[in-house]
Regions:
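Functionally critical loop-and-helix segments that line ligand-binding/catalytic clefts
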Residues: 160-162, 166, 175, 188-197, ...
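Right-handed parallel beta-helix
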Residues: 2-108, 113
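Detector for repetitive beta-architecture
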Residues: 2, 7, 31, 43, ...
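Extended, compositionally simple hydrophobic/Ser/Thr-rich segments
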Residues: 54-56, 65-67, 84-86, 95-99, ...
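Flexible loop residues that form catalytic
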Residues: 13, 51, 64, 94, ...
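Extracellular beta-strand/beta-solenoid scaffold signature
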Residues: 17-26, 41-44, 48, 68-79, ...
Length: 337
């Protein structure tokens, strides 16, 4: 209790994932402070197990040199640990900042490069994740089987793994995802059966979803999400649904900006006079053959897409409808990144 570790150089932990070899481990303690310390060549950086009200601040953390991503440990790992503050850490060549069965934690103003995921929660609730920036990882932020958390003002750039995302929600309910920027990722937002809990809503508002391969990918939708005031710009595909029978019609859309919107604004109120409609054409080739996205923008693919819209071979399916699409980006400054 009340241990303070400040201005330390900590190097050379063991390599056992089973034993959770770490630079610093806290077991059933309270009020630990780890500040302004450097962790190098450690499997796990800081490991909190039933450790509450810790402050992990201003540290430089990297994992074992030469280890590929699955063999690395987490920069910070919280297990059944609550009310902790994890802020202003620089994390690189590590795995995740992860919280398992941990609630009421604040994870903010951390910076990371070349990790696996940025922030990862499992079976956790009531956490605040804000003002973090991560780039070059295999994935972005992952929230799995978690509830009632606020995720705001984060920047996720160039998540380039096979399933690279800005943010992924897996069986996650009651989330507020707002004012984030998802840029140059394989997917900006991935929603997998989220929300899960009946009667809950995920609110996704005022985010910048920019220049991703897919802006929004939906899987097995069963409950409503609300999409409000987001900017979809430069994405190869604005949105897709990969699960027939999903209840995507439950989702609500309003006040979003879509760079492919072709409507007019005769009364100049900044809102399009006709709804933005996004259809899925069964003959749109890369819905079924993702490798064809390599040829996006080519003359042949552009021609096929034009013909599909002009004379589709099958009835298109409506994926989303925004009745009040914006004519200009909601956040023009960020949209020019």
């Amino acid at each position: 209790k009340n241990v303070k570790l400040i201005n330390l150089n900590i190097e050379g932990s063991g390599t056992s994932q089973m034993d959770l070899n770490a630079g610093v481990s806290c077991l059933k303690g309270n009020n630990l402070l780890v500040e302004k310390s450097r962790f190098k060549d450690v499997l796990f950086g800081i490991e909190l197990s039933e450790c509450n009200q810790a402050v992990i601040r201003d540290n430089n953390i990297t994992s074992k040199e030469g280890f590929d991503v699955p063999r690395r440990g987490d920069a910070v790992r919280a297990w059944y640990s609550h009310e902790n503050l994890i802020e202003r850490n620089y994390v690189y060549n590590s795995r995740d900042i992860v919280a398992w069965f941990s609630s009421n934690n604040i994870i903010r103003k951390n910076f990371g490069k070349n990790n696996r995921y940025a922030v990862h929660t499992m079976y956790s609730a009531d956490n605040l994740i804000e003002d973090n920036e991560f780039s070059g990882g295999a994935g972005g932020m992952y929230f799995m089987f978690s509830t009632n958390s606020l995720v705001r003002r984060n920047v996720i750039i160039n998540s380039n793994g096979a399933f690279g995302v800005g943010i992924a929600l897996k069986d996650a309910s009651g989330f507020n995802i707002r004012e984030n920027t998802f840029l140059y990722n394989s997917r900006g937002i991935y929603s997998d059966r989220s929300p899960l809990n009946p009667g809950t809503v995920n609110l996704i508002e005022n985010n910048q979803i920019l220049y991703n391969v897919i802006g929004l990918q939906m899987h097995a939708t069963q409950e409503k999400s609300v999409f409000r005031g987001n900017d979809f710009i430069g994405n190869m595909e604005t949105a897709i649904n990969d699960t027939p029978g999903s209840k995507i019609e439950l989702n609500e859309w309003s006040g979003n900006y879509f760079d492919e919107y072709e409507g007019l604004d005769v009364d100049r109120d900044g809102i399009g006079d006709t709804p933005y409609l996004h259809f899925v054409y069964a003959d749109k080739l890369w819905q079924y053959y993702p490798t064809l996205r390599f040829f996006y923008g080519s003359t042949v693919i552009s021609g096929l897409n034009f013909l599909a819209k002009l004379a589709p071979f099958s009835e298109p399916l409506k994926l989303l409808e925004d009745g009040s699409p914006k004519m200009r980006p909601n956040n023009a400054e960020k949209a020019t990144l």
